[in-house]
Amino acid sequence: FADEPELRQERDRMLASGNPFGCGEDIETLDFDSYAPFPFLPPVTTGHFGAVYEIRTYKLKHGGVTPTIAAWEAAVPARVALSPLVIAMYALDGPARFTHIWPFASLDQRAAVRADSVAKGIWPPKGGPQWLTGEMYSTIALPTAISPLA
């Protein structure tokens, strides 16, 4: 969304509608999370970056958003030399957390890049893990044909 009022307007529209996406009969519940990109990152670029995407969310300790962003800002240039980053973003509502999305050619490439980044001391970002609560969720996703990341 271009700005917070536009985000709020769309959220209100979805909450008020019994059929917000043209498939209301198939929806039991909807959850909404609002995020802002880490401020040092460029805008998301669409295109084909991989066949597999990892979407990972970490819950943060109170006060952890700013130091996490700083740690990532220092570490991302070396990390993206190994594989691209779609986005890293922090939650605007709910518990303190951040989500990042990485594309990979395959699950094997994901494992190799992660191992390489740790072996080289590139990742995780120095000072970042101390702000994590230990609660993490990781999803492996395959883009559909209509995805802007397919």
Per-region residue spans from a language model:
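Short amphipathic alpha-helices within nucleic acid-binding modules
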Residues: 3-16, 66-70, 106-119
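Short glycine-/aliphatic-rich beta-strand segments at the starts of folded cytosolic domains
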Residues: 52-58
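Short hydrophobic/aromatic beta-strand micro-patches
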Residues: 1-2, 59, 101-103
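Glycine-rich beta-strand-turn "strand-cap" elements at beta-sheet edges
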Residues: 12-51, 82-99, 103-105, 115, ...
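A short, structured loop/turn motif at beta-sheet edges
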Residues: 42-43, 61-63, 108
